[in-house]
Amino acid sequence: MKSNTWCINAFHSLSASNDGTTRPCCMYVSQDPDSKYILGEKTIEEHLNHPELQQLKKDCETGVRNTGCIRCWEEEDGGGKSKRLRDNERYNQQQGLVYFEASLGNQCNIRCRTCNPHSSSQWVDEGYDTQYHKIYAIKDYRSHIKKFYKSFEEESNFWPDLESHLHTIKHLEFYGGEPFMSKKMWSILELAVEKGYAKDIEVHYATNGTLWPKQVEVWKHFKRISVHFSIDGVGKQFEYMRYLADWEVVQANMAKSRTQEGNLTIGWFITLSNLNVYYLPEIIEEYYRAYPDFGSFLNLVHGPRHFNISIMPEDVKKIVLDRLNSIPKSYRHVWTQLPGIIGFIENGTPDPAMWDTFLEEIKIHDDYRKQDYAEVFPEFAKIIGLAHD
C-alpha cells in the first residue's frame, strides 16, 4: 500500500527549468540547488537518479513530508488539490520516464510583469538596467543569461536524449519562454508521429496567446492536446500584466483555437499574484461571459516571494478574501478551485519586508516601462497606498 506522501512524480517525472536544471516536477523546491544536473551535460537517466531524487523517493515510500514538496503541502493544507494529488490520480505505476515537462529556454516575445530575464529574452535589457547592473558587468551578464537557453539550443545533446525516451513518455508539457517559438519542440512531435508513439502521448502547452502555430496539423496524431492561454487580466489589465501582448490579438487566437477539431482542449491558465488577485472576480466574469466552453485553471505565483499572495498584510488580506468570496457560487467549476486559493491566503503569514519589496518593484518597473499601475488597477492601488493624490 502506498504511503500518504507518495507521489508519482518522484519516480517517473522530470521538470526542466529554463537553464536545463531539473527537478521531479515544477512545484518542487530543490534543497541543494548547487548540485543540480543540467540537461545536455548529463543524460536524462542520470537526472532521474540524482541523489536528491533518491532521498525524495525514500521519503515518498515511508510517509515523510519531504521539504522540497512544500508547495504541494501548503496547497493541500489549505484545502486545495495539489499537483501531487492530481498527478497521482491521472497516472498509475509506470516504467521509465512517463511525464516530462520543460520550460524551453527563455525565447519569448513578451515581457510579463511577474517574469524575469531567465524566462524571457524580452526581459534581458530591463533586467540589467533595473537590477543586474549592480551585480554584473554587461559582458558577464550576457554570459550569465546564455545558460538559460543553452540546454534547448538546436545543437544541444538534450534533444536526441529526449528522443530516446519517447517510447515510455505518456505526457509532454511545454512552457517558455513561449513554447510555440521552439523549432525543436515541433521536430520532437513529428518524430513521435513517425515512430508511432504519438497516439499514446498527451501534450500540454501554456502559451501567452500572442501566436497561433502553423504546425497544428501534427496535433491530430496525438492522444490529446491541451492548450492553456495564460490570462492574468482582461483588456488593459491583461496588457499591463503581459507587457507587449495585445489583448485583441490574443482574443483572435483564442477564436482560431475554437476552429480546431478533434483531440484539442482549450483553457485559461489564470496565474494569481499580489498584482491581480483582487481582480479575479472580473477575470472570472469575462471567462464565463465569453469563453464558457474553455476549461480554466487557477495557478499561484510562489516566487518571487514578493508576488506571493500569502504574504499580504492582514488588512489587505481581509479585503481580498471578501472579494474572492463574492464570486457567485453558480460558477461551479471555479469554486472547485477557489477554496484552495482562499485557504492559501488565510494560512499565509504577512511579510512586511516582502510587501515593501512588492510595492517598490511596481514603482521601479512602472518607471522603466512608462506604465502606471494606479491607472490600470485603480481600486487596488488605492487600497495598497499607490493611488495618485
Language-model regions, residue ranges each:
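Membrane-interface junctions of multi-pass transporters
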Residues: V29-R71
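Short, basic/aromatic recognition patches
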Residues: M1-N9
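Short, intrinsically disordered, charge-biased short linear motifs at domain edges
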Residues: H12-S15, P51-T62, G96-S103
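Recognition helices and adjacent regulatory flanks at domain boundaries
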Residues: G68-V98, C108-I110, Q131
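Core AdoMet radical
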Residues: L97-Q107, H118-E154, H167-K183, K195-P213, ...
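Local cysteine-cluster metal-coordination motifs and their immediate loop/turn environment
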Residues: N9, R23-M27, R65-D77, Q107-P117
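Conserved C-terminal portion of the radical SAM core fold
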Residues: N18-D19, H204, R224-H228, D246-H388
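A short acidic/small-residue loop/turn micro-motif
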Residues: T5, V29-D32, S120
